[in-house]
Amino acid sequence: MYDDSYVPGFEDSEAGSADSYTSRPSLDSDVSLEEDRESARREVESQAQQQLERAKHKPVAFAVRTNVSYCGVLDEECPVQGSGVNFEAKDFLHIKEKYSNDWWIGRLVKEGGDIAFIPSPQRLESIRLKQEQKARRSGNPSSLSDIGNRRSPPPSLAKQKQKQAEHVPPYDVVPSMRPVVLVGPSLKGYEVTDMMQKALFDFLKHRFDGRISITRVTADLSLAKRSVLNNPGKRTIIERSSARSSIAEVQSEIERIFELAKSLQLVVLDADTINHPAQLAKTSLAPIIVFVKVSSPKVLQRLIRSRGKSQMKHLTVQMMAYDKLVQCPPESFDVILDENQLDDACEHLAEYLEVYWRATHHPAPGPGMLGPPSAIPGLQNQQLLGERGEEHSPLERDSLMPSDEASESSRQAWTGSSQRSSRHLEEDYADAYQDLYQPHRQHTSGLPSANGHDPQDRLLAQDSEHDHNDRNWQRNRPWPKDSY
């Protein structure tokens, strides 16, 4: 009688039990997969951390200047959480190696800056696109109202601005060490400016002995604009219009400066044609601009008059150059030397360069290690570095070759700075950059390298057999005045 009976809910409960039974392995497998993923993530992060540590002992491959801001702490996709770099626009980064297509390994150039993960240009572009999509979805009332309230720009102008915005890369490749360039107080090639700058060159050569390369550059570096070097059409126009400095010579000089900077020594350029910061603003050199500034135009006039009639004939052009420099905003320069005494100005510059030296040299790796030409293949077309062997070009050998004449003249000028009087100057400028340093642009061999010279304490020793070199110094400039 019970065979045909039906118990309500029995079949349903059986089915339910079967369903619940078969669903348990699915839940267990989900948990297992989650654990596997977490384990794999920890393994990848551990390997990334190890690679980060190994990178501390690797040389700098190249350097970049940032055009955007980035906060690595907020980036959840960083290979090691909390190990992303933070930087603002116009900061400098030393790149050690490539970790992946989205990440590099390097450090922010600052004191105490540690090795960290740096987003690649592809990564930054991806972030920018996501932010734009998010902004379009959410809508920005303030921006919409602004657009409605103002007149639309002409189509051509709008397209031009859009094109410029689209073509600004997140990074610009720059020398691993920013080259130091002196400007002021007036035009190079005239005695007052040359003497004051030569005093600083001599000081730097001995203060940073073994850590500095001082090299002469005669090519017009103002032609080394990124837009020109990357545009064959503009390059041809400039080569036709420039009688004194071809673009090929400029390109060669840029490559030489990049090569010098790879050693992570301080690089100082005795650049003949650079008299204003705007001349290098659009180049890839990212220089440290040092403004040698006198206290007033009257002081500069007195200094020029003290050099005799040959310099007085060109007083007007020198004063015009001085006016252009003092009209520049302070942010145009990295260092302004406005001290009234040479020793104070030298110490000011030395303190700045010591801080920069510590910022560019991470404690772990050796400061003199040379990096490979390029660790990132994707940036080879952006870099201005050529494949160069160990041999220097004739111009480079000439610039870096120690010159006995130049060295002895520098020592004599430096030694005499504490002995000669500055009676030609007014009392308010009594000890300011004593009138002792003759124009240094007579040397065809350029300034010698800091390496291999006598230590600074030997500069105080008198060497009477070379006194006649100082007295018989030739004042004739080797180049026409109109080239300045």
UniProtKB/Swiss-Prot annotation:
GO terms for cellular component: apical plasma membrane; cytoplasm; L-type voltage-gated calcium channel complex; membrane; synapse; voltage-gated calcium channel complex. PROSITE patterns: SH3. One of its GO terms (molecular function) is protein kinase binding. Coiled coil: none annotated. Residues 1-52, 129-170, 388-484 are annotated as: Disordered. Residues 59-128 form the SH3 domain. Residues 409-420 have a biased composition (Polar residues). Detected in brain. Belongs to the calcium channel beta subunit family. This is Voltage-dependent L-type calcium channel subunit beta-3.
